[in-house]
């Protein structure tokens, strides 16, 4: 059984998946919501992999952690639909600074802007999922 992670953005969703032992997170793909249907893509992932849980990158505001933003409401709606559709546990995991951390690492490694743009979403999902895996394994 594996754990799936979604880093939900307004246009793209970064996807990462754990190894079967739930030790390491691996980049999986980036879903372009302007070109692809989220649930069709997830149906394929669920058919090909044994997913037991979904970790959702949850963007809690560092200044107003109790404030429900429009983005949080959208993510909450997606979480409800995922739970209903796939009958798996949903974990909302703090994703603050995940994209910034990944972008900084890629810049330090001199990865070009064009290449960063292609991988940053799925690597942010890896960053989020690895944080969760480290937590459950500690």
From Swiss-Prot:
The keyword Protein biosynthesis does not apply. SUPFAM superfamilies: Ribonuclease H-like. Coiled coil: none annotated. GO terms for cellular component: cytosol. It is an enzyme of class 3 (hydrolase). It holds the Pfam family RuvX. Its EC number is 3.1.-.-. InterPro entries: RNaseH-like_sf (IPR012337), YqgF (IPR005227), YqgF/RNaseH-like_dom (IPR006641), YqgF/RNaseH-like_dom_sf (IPR037027). The keyword Cytoplasm applies. Signal peptide: none annotated. It is found in: Cytoplasm. Keywords: Cytoplasm, Hydrolase, Nuclease, Ribosome biogenesis. PANTHER family: POLYNUCLEOTIDYL TRANSFERASE, RIBONUCLEASE H-LIKE SUPERFAMILY PROTEIN. Could be a nuclease involved in processing of the 5'-end of pre-16S rRNA. Belongs to the YqgF nuclease family. This is Putative pre-16S rRNA nuclease.
